[in-house]
């Protein structure tokens, strides 16, 4: 009976000592958190291993992440994975689709993003661009003659139109002089002509008898306007004037219309402010609808694919510029010892318990061996 009690005692003590020793060793990894002193003498094994080596741990964790976890090869392999690319493209298409089907107005979106001033800036910028383009255009064309400034097609159209213009002028003139207003105007012109020529009027009156001068002149004027020779004469005159105009400088236009007036007139016609305001009052969906399908089906996949290709080619440079090791090191360095302990224990809690139990098991086995040795020695 005493023999079995001795074996049980040695086994129990061995298990307790083994389990407690391992448990204490695990605790000494983290505790105490700070060095302990007896007088000026620092107690050995204080602080615990991890608090004492926390800075080194932070550095090593940073190196481990960069050298073994987030490696350029691993990230590059992920970026070139076909399933990953499909998933990313699908996600991008869904998100872009949500934005492009938004029924809120562009103005509301700008206000929401606190960039409502964009409307004023856009209006000013567009007007400034228009002004600069007009001034540059005028600056260039003011150095040309009309012949140089106008395209060849315009020259042809004008020259082909001159006979038609002559016919139109003569037709309108004929209609005018056939009317009562035209006859009255012609009569006044004749009266004014003979007003200072009294003797000539009496002489003409002797030849015409009771018929008024205007009744004789009006048919002749209309007849003259209807003759082919008159049309050719007017056509030749217009052609000569056109030839003269082609040789004149465009800059002469500035004497009739100032540059500022041209710019102002164009800006008034364009109505930049009203156009921008009308554009911003449209919903995002209205603005994007004409190009929505093209953007989602073609542009988004293309952009994502090119972005992933660029990322794959430059992943090493990106990681170097991110300084991930330093980021991990800085983050770990900011952890309190308690948080670091909780973090490690949350990952290795079960394994550390098993180490404690293993220590108890080994201690118990050693106790059994001791008990057997005592039995044989007796």
Curated annotation (Swiss-Prot):
It comes from Bacillus cereus (strain 03BB102). GO terms for cellular component: plasma membrane. Keywords: Cell membrane, Membrane, Transmembrane, Transmembrane helix. Pfam families: DUF445. Belongs to the UPF0754 family. It is a multi-pass membrane protein. Its main location: membrane. It comes from the Bacteria. It is found in: Cell membrane. This is UPF0754 membrane protein BCA_0919. The chain crosses the membrane at residues 1-21, 357-377.
């Amino acid at each position: 009976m005493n023999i079995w009690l001795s074996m049980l005692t040695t086994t129990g003590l061995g298990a307790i000592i083994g389990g407690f020793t391992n448990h204490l060793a695990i605790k000494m990894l983290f505790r105490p958190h700070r060095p302990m002193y007896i007088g000026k003498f620092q107690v050995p094994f204080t602080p615990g291993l991890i608090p004492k080596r926390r800075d080194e741990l932070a550095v090593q964790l940073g190196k481990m992440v960069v050298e073994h976890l987030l490696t350029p090869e691993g990230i590059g392999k992920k970026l070139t994975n076909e399933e990953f690319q499909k998933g990313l493209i699908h996600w991008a298409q869904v998100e872009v689709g949500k934005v492009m089907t938004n029924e809120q107005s562009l103005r509301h979106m700008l206000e929401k993003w606190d960039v409502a001033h964009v409307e004023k800036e856009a209006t000013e910028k567009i007007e400034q661009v228009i002004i600069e383009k007009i001034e540059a255009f005028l600056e260039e064309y003011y150095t040309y003659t009309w012949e140089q400034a106008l395209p060849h097609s315009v020259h042809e159209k004008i020259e082909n139109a001159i006979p038609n213009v002559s016919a139109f002028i003569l037709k309108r003139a004929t209609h005018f002089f056939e009317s009562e207003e035209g006859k009255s105007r012609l009569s006044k012109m004749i009266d004014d002509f003979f007003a200072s020529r009294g003797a000539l009027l009496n002489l003409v009156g002797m030849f015409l008898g009771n018929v008024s001068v205007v009744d004789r002149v009006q048919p002749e004027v209309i007849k003259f306007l209807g003759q082919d020779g008159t049309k050719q004469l007017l056509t030749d005159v217009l052609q000569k004037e056109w030839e003269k105009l082609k040789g004149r400088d465009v800059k002469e236009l500035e004497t009739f219309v100032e540059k500022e007036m041209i710019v102002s007139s164009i800006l008034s016609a364009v109505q930049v402010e009203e156009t921008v305001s009308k554009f911003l009052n449209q919903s995002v969906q209205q603005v994007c609808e004409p190009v929505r399908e093209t953007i989602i089906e073609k542009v988004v996949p293309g952009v994502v694919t090119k972005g992933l290709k660029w990322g794959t080619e430059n992943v090493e440079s990106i990681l170097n510029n991110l300084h991930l090791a330093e980021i991990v090191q800085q983050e770990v360095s900011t952890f309190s010892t308690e948080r670091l302990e909780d973090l490690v224990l949350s990952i290795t809690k079960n394994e550390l318990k098993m180490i404690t139990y293993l220590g108890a098991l080994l201690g118990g086995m050693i106790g059994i061996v001791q008990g057997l040795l005592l039995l044989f020695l007796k």
